Amino acid sequence: MGAILGKKIGMTRLYNDKREAVPCTIIQAGPCFVTQVKNAEKDGYDAVQIGIGERKEHKVTKPMLGHYKKAGVTPGYMMAEFDASMFDVELAAGSPVSVESFKEGEIVNVLGVSKGKGFAGVVKRHNFGGGSRTHGQSDRLRAPGSVGGSSDPSRTFKGTRMGGRMGSDNVTVRNLQVVKIMAESNLIMVKGSVPGPKNSYVKIVSIKK
């Protein structure tokens, strides 16, 4: 069991014992440190807060800088909370968290923010088929079509699929296999793709059994 933060480096391929190419995502999981430990008596629930990376102090707000100094760690780029039951050992503020809490072959979930696509129409965003390409029409190729009748229902229903901002959603990719762990470099490689562009931050959590 384990949980950690990481930065998506990119994708590569590894070859298994059967000489099969396995697509892998490389994640820089560390250096990570515990920034706060919450308990039920004081905070109402048990959790461990983790930060990743090292950031210059002048780029961090004063309240956050005080939070990091209280834990005795350098300011990081991201913080996230995980359930205390995700960790096999008892952690304290300032404790390091490494990829060694995972094992090769283990199954994990990876959480992140998907790539932002900007404003997209209904064909790209919702896979609409678009209008007819023939019979004289000239401007209905990628139009959404009707979104509500005039007299009945005289309105557009909530949730009607239309154009809008696409991407930048919280996404969880489940059941990814840990292919390789390089503890000396804080690298973890998982089979398949994970959300977000390169250099985006993700959460890696073990699957609770």
Swiss-Prot record:
Region (Disordered): 128-168
GO molecular function: rRNA binding; structural constituent of ribosome
GO cellular component: cytosolic large ribosomal subunit
Biological process (GO), any one: translation
Keyword tags: Ribonucleoprotein, Ribosomal protein, RNA-binding, rRNA-binding
PROSITE patterns the record matches: RIBOSOMAL_L3
Transmembrane segments: none
Classification via Pfam families: Ribosomal_L3
PANTHER family: 50S RIBOSOMAL PROTEIN L3, LARGE RIBOSOMAL SUBUNIT PROTEIN UL3C
Subunit text: Part of the 50S ribosomal subunit. Forms a cluster with proteins L14 and L19.
Family: Belongs to the universal ribosomal protein uL3 family.
NCBIfam families: L3_bact (TIGR03625)
Physiological role: One of the primary rRNA binding proteins, it binds directly near the 3'-end of the 23S rRNA, where it nucleates assembly of the 50S subunit.
Protein name: Large ribosomal subunit protein uL3
Source organism phylogeny: Bacteria, Pseudomonadati, Chlorobiota, Chlorobiia, Chlorobiales
